[in-house]
Amino acid sequence: MTSLPAVCFQRVSFGYGAGEVLSEVDFDILPGDNVCVVGPNGGGKTTLLKLMLGLLKPDSGQIRVFGESPEKMQGALGYVPQHMHFDPVFPVRALDVVLMGRVGRGSFGFSSREDRKRAEAALDQVGQAGLAQAQFTELSGGQRQAVLIARALVGSPRAILLDEPDAHIDPGRRDKLKQLLDYLPTDITRILVSHNMDFVVSSVEKVICVHRHVHVHPTSELTTERIRNLFGSELRLVRHDREHPTASAHHHPQADADQGGQY
Protein backbone atom coordinates (compact mmCIF):
# COMPACT_ATOMS: atom_id res chain seq x y z
CA MET A 1 0.00 0.00 0.00
CA THR A 2 1.40 3.37 -1.05
CA SER A 3 1.85 5.78 1.86
CA LEU A 4 0.23 9.20 1.73
CA PRO A 5 2.45 12.23 1.02
CA ALA A 6 3.68 14.07 4.09
CA VAL A 7 2.59 17.32 2.40
CA CYS A 8 0.44 17.66 -0.71
CA PHE A 9 -0.42 20.96 -2.44
CA GLN A 10 -3.05 20.78 -5.21
CA ARG A 11 -3.55 23.92 -7.32
CA VAL A 12 -3.01 26.15 -4.28
CA SER A 13 -3.15 29.93 -4.70
CA PHE A 14 -2.68 32.53 -1.98
CA GLY A 15 -2.29 36.29 -1.79
CA TYR A 16 -2.14 39.14 0.68
CA GLY A 17 -4.85 41.57 -0.38
CA ALA A 18 -4.60 42.17 -4.11
CA GLY A 19 -1.05 40.80 -4.35
CA GLU A 20 -0.82 37.13 -5.33
CA VAL A 21 2.12 35.36 -3.69
CA LEU A 22 1.50 31.77 -4.82
CA SER A 23 -0.32 30.78 -8.00
CA GLU A 24 -1.78 27.28 -8.60
CA VAL A 25 1.01 25.50 -6.76
CA ASP A 26 1.25 21.70 -7.12
CA PHE A 27 3.80 19.51 -5.35
CA ASP A 28 4.19 16.53 -3.01
CA ILE A 29 6.68 15.99 -0.20
CA LEU A 30 7.02 12.30 0.65
CA PRO A 31 7.45 10.85 4.15
CA GLY A 32 11.14 10.90 5.06
CA ASP A 33 12.04 13.49 2.41
CA ASN A 34 14.81 15.96 3.23
CA VAL A 35 13.96 19.13 1.29
CA CYS A 36 14.74 22.84 1.22
CA VAL A 37 12.55 25.73 0.08
CA VAL A 38 14.50 28.44 -1.76
CA GLY A 39 13.58 31.60 -3.62
CA PRO A 40 13.93 35.39 -3.67
CA ASN A 41 12.70 37.68 -0.92
CA GLY A 42 8.94 38.02 -1.21
CA GLY A 43 8.73 34.85 -3.30
CA GLY A 44 6.46 32.98 -0.88
CA LYS A 45 8.82 30.74 1.11
CA THR A 46 7.58 31.58 4.62
CA THR A 47 4.01 31.78 3.30
CA LEU A 48 4.42 28.19 2.09
CA LEU A 49 5.43 27.06 5.59
CA LYS A 50 2.51 28.90 7.21
CA LEU A 51 0.10 27.21 4.81
CA MET A 52 1.55 23.80 5.72
CA LEU A 53 1.13 24.62 9.42
CA GLY A 54 -2.48 25.73 8.96
CA LEU A 55 -1.65 29.27 10.10
CA LEU A 56 -2.90 30.57 6.75
CA LYS A 57 -5.71 29.25 4.55
CA PRO A 58 -5.33 29.10 0.76
CA ASP A 59 -7.52 31.30 -1.42
CA SER A 60 -8.09 28.27 -3.63
CA GLY A 61 -6.88 24.71 -3.97
CA GLN A 62 -6.31 22.02 -1.37
CA ILE A 63 -3.54 21.24 1.12
CA ARG A 64 -3.17 17.89 2.83
CA VAL A 65 -0.73 16.91 5.59
CA PHE A 66 -0.47 13.12 5.90
CA GLY A 67 -3.86 12.92 4.21
CA GLU A 68 -5.67 15.39 6.49
CA SER A 69 -6.22 19.15 6.60
CA PRO A 70 -3.32 21.10 8.17
CA GLU A 71 -5.57 22.22 11.04
CA LYS A 72 -6.16 18.60 12.07
CA MET A 73 -2.49 17.64 11.81
CA GLN A 74 -0.77 20.47 13.68
CA GLY A 75 0.44 18.00 16.30
CA ALA A 76 2.25 16.04 13.58
CA LEU A 77 4.41 19.03 12.61
CA GLY A 78 7.27 20.46 14.63
CA TYR A 79 8.12 24.08 13.83
CA VAL A 80 11.45 25.85 14.38
CA PRO A 81 11.13 29.64 13.91
CA GLN A 82 14.02 31.89 12.91
CA HIS A 83 14.19 33.29 16.42
CA MET A 84 12.26 33.45 19.67
CA HIS A 85 12.33 36.41 22.04
CA PHE A 86 11.89 36.51 25.81
CA ASP A 87 12.17 39.42 28.20
CA PRO A 88 15.66 39.03 29.75
CA VAL A 89 14.26 40.40 33.03
CA PHE A 90 11.92 37.39 33.23
CA PRO A 91 14.15 34.28 33.37
CA VAL A 92 13.23 31.32 31.17
CA ARG A 93 15.37 28.19 31.25
CA ALA A 94 16.23 26.23 28.13
CA LEU A 95 14.27 23.33 29.63
CA ASP A 96 11.18 25.57 29.93
CA VAL A 97 11.44 26.46 26.24
CA VAL A 98 11.61 22.78 25.26
CA LEU A 99 8.63 21.99 27.52
CA MET A 100 6.51 24.39 25.43
CA GLY A 101 6.53 21.67 22.79
CA ARG A 102 4.83 19.31 25.27
CA VAL A 103 2.27 21.47 27.06
CA GLY A 104 0.54 23.10 24.08
CA ARG A 105 0.73 26.39 22.25
CA GLY A 106 0.81 28.64 25.30
CA SER A 107 4.15 29.76 26.69
CA PHE A 108 3.59 28.08 30.05
CA GLY A 109 1.39 25.38 31.49
CA PHE A 110 1.38 22.33 33.71
CA SER A 111 4.12 19.84 32.91
CA SER A 112 4.30 16.33 34.27
CA ARG A 113 7.34 14.33 35.29
CA GLU A 114 7.06 12.49 31.96
CA ASP A 115 7.02 15.83 30.10
CA ARG A 116 10.22 16.92 31.85
CA LYS A 117 11.84 13.55 31.16
CA ARG A 118 11.03 13.85 27.46
CA ALA A 119 12.25 17.47 27.35
CA GLU A 120 15.58 16.47 28.88
CA ALA A 121 15.84 13.60 26.38
CA ALA A 122 15.17 16.02 23.49
CA LEU A 123 17.98 18.32 24.67
CA ASP A 124 20.27 15.30 24.86
CA GLN A 125 19.18 14.27 21.36
CA VAL A 126 20.54 17.55 19.93
CA GLY A 127 23.71 17.35 22.00
CA GLN A 128 22.74 20.03 24.53
CA ALA A 129 21.88 18.10 27.70
CA GLY A 130 24.07 20.44 29.75
CA LEU A 131 21.93 23.49 28.87
CA ALA A 132 18.72 22.40 30.62
CA GLN A 133 19.06 24.91 33.49
CA ALA A 134 20.73 27.68 31.44
CA GLN A 135 18.83 30.92 30.80
CA PHE A 136 17.61 30.95 27.20
CA THR A 137 18.41 34.66 26.74
CA GLU A 138 22.05 34.06 27.68
CA LEU A 139 22.66 31.34 25.08
CA SER A 140 24.54 31.84 21.83
CA GLY A 141 22.65 31.89 18.52
CA GLY A 142 23.67 28.31 17.77
CA GLN A 143 22.65 27.10 21.23
CA ARG A 144 19.25 28.80 20.95
CA GLN A 145 18.75 27.13 17.58
CA ALA A 146 19.52 23.74 19.14
CA VAL A 147 17.03 24.37 21.98
CA LEU A 148 14.32 25.35 19.48
CA ILE A 149 14.96 22.18 17.49
CA ALA A 150 14.66 20.19 20.73
CA ARG A 151 11.35 21.96 21.40
CA ALA A 152 10.09 20.84 17.98
CA LEU A 153 11.27 17.26 18.55
CA VAL A 154 9.81 16.79 22.03
CA GLY A 155 6.29 16.44 20.63
CA SER A 156 7.38 13.42 18.51
CA PRO A 157 6.44 15.06 15.17
CA ARG A 158 6.22 13.21 11.88
CA ALA A 159 7.69 16.22 10.06
CA ILE A 160 9.78 19.19 11.16
CA LEU A 161 9.74 22.63 9.50
CA LEU A 162 12.71 24.97 9.97
CA ASP A 163 12.49 28.62 8.88
CA GLU A 164 16.02 29.76 7.94
CA PRO A 165 17.83 27.88 10.72
CA ASP A 166 21.18 29.25 9.49
CA ALA A 167 20.09 32.91 9.42
CA HIS A 168 21.34 33.97 12.86
CA ILE A 169 24.54 32.00 13.29
CA ASP A 170 28.10 32.75 12.21
CA PRO A 171 29.20 31.22 8.87
CA GLY A 172 31.81 29.18 10.74
CA ARG A 173 29.08 27.51 12.81
CA ARG A 174 27.02 26.27 9.86
CA ASP A 175 28.83 22.93 9.92
CA LYS A 176 27.72 22.62 13.54
CA LEU A 177 24.13 23.29 12.45
CA LYS A 178 24.38 20.65 9.73
CA GLN A 179 25.64 18.22 12.37
CA LEU A 180 22.71 19.25 14.57
CA LEU A 181 20.24 18.46 11.77
CA ASP A 182 21.90 15.07 11.40
CA TYR A 183 20.69 14.29 14.93
CA LEU A 184 17.11 14.26 13.61
CA PRO A 185 15.60 10.78 13.22
CA THR A 186 15.84 9.62 9.61
CA ASP A 187 12.12 8.81 9.43
CA ILE A 188 11.15 12.44 10.15
CA THR A 189 10.32 14.52 7.07
CA ARG A 190 12.56 17.61 7.07
CA ILE A 191 11.50 20.83 5.37
CA LEU A 192 13.73 23.87 5.74
CA VAL A 193 13.92 27.37 4.28
CA SER A 194 17.35 28.84 3.55
CA HIS A 195 18.97 31.62 1.53
CA ASN A 196 22.41 30.03 1.78
CA MET A 197 22.90 27.80 -1.24
CA ASP A 198 26.13 26.35 0.13
CA PHE A 199 24.18 25.12 3.15
CA VAL A 200 21.34 23.86 0.92
CA VAL A 201 23.50 21.80 -1.43
CA SER A 202 25.35 20.13 1.44
CA SER A 203 22.28 19.45 3.60
CA VAL A 204 19.29 18.30 1.52
CA GLU A 205 18.35 15.94 -1.31
CA LYS A 206 15.56 17.91 -2.98
CA VAL A 207 14.96 21.63 -3.56
CA ILE A 208 11.59 23.37 -3.86
CA CYS A 209 12.08 26.60 -5.82
CA VAL A 210 9.37 29.17 -5.06
CA HIS A 211 8.58 32.32 -7.03
CA ARG A 212 4.76 32.51 -7.30
CA HIS A 213 4.93 29.06 -8.89
CA VAL A 214 6.81 26.05 -7.51
CA HIS A 215 9.44 23.89 -9.21
CA VAL A 216 10.90 20.80 -7.51
CA HIS A 217 14.39 19.54 -8.39
CA PRO A 218 16.91 17.08 -6.93
CA THR A 219 19.76 19.05 -5.37
CA SER A 220 22.19 17.48 -7.86
CA GLU A 221 20.30 19.16 -10.73
CA LEU A 222 20.45 22.65 -9.24
CA THR A 223 22.53 24.71 -11.70
CA THR A 224 23.21 28.40 -12.25
CA GLU A 225 21.25 28.34 -15.52
CA ARG A 226 18.26 26.66 -13.91
CA ILE A 227 18.24 29.13 -11.00
CA ARG A 228 18.44 32.11 -13.37
CA ASN A 229 15.61 30.73 -15.47
CA LEU A 230 13.47 30.48 -12.34
CA PHE A 231 14.44 33.64 -10.47
CA GLY A 232 16.19 35.96 -12.91
CA SER A 233 19.54 37.34 -11.74
CA GLU A 234 18.83 37.28 -8.01
CA LEU A 235 20.57 33.98 -7.27
CA ARG A 236 23.84 32.67 -8.65
CA LEU A 237 25.32 29.21 -8.12
CA VAL A 238 29.08 29.02 -7.58
CA ARG A 239 30.95 25.70 -7.62
CA HIS A 240 33.96 25.89 -5.29
CA ASP A 241 35.44 22.39 -5.60
CA ARG A 242 35.06 19.74 -8.28
CA GLU A 243 35.44 16.94 -5.76
CA HIS A 244 32.98 18.47 -3.29
CA PRO A 245 30.60 20.76 -5.22
CA THR A 246 28.96 23.50 -3.18
CA ALA A 247 27.10 26.65 -3.98
CA SER A 248 26.56 30.18 -2.80
CA ALA A 249 23.65 32.56 -3.15
CA HIS A 250 24.16 36.13 -4.27
CA HIS A 251 21.23 38.52 -4.21
CA HIS A 252 21.03 41.37 -6.68
CA PRO A 253 20.63 44.50 -4.47
CA GLN A 254 18.05 46.12 -6.73
CA ALA A 255 16.12 42.88 -7.06
CA ASP A 256 15.95 42.61 -3.27
CA ALA A 257 14.82 46.21 -3.03
CA ASP A 258 12.15 45.66 -5.66
CA GLN A 259 10.79 42.62 -3.81
CA GLY A 260 10.04 44.65 -0.69
CA GLY A 261 9.19 42.75 2.51
CA GLN A 262 9.89 39.10 2.95
CA TYR A 263 6.98 36.65 2.90
Regions found by a protein language model. Give the residues of each.
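Catalytic Walker B motif of ABC-type/P-loop ATPase nucleotide-binding domains
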Residues: 160-164
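ABC ATPase nucleotide-binding domains
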Residues: 223-263
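Conserved ABC ATPase "signature" region
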Residues: 99, 113-131
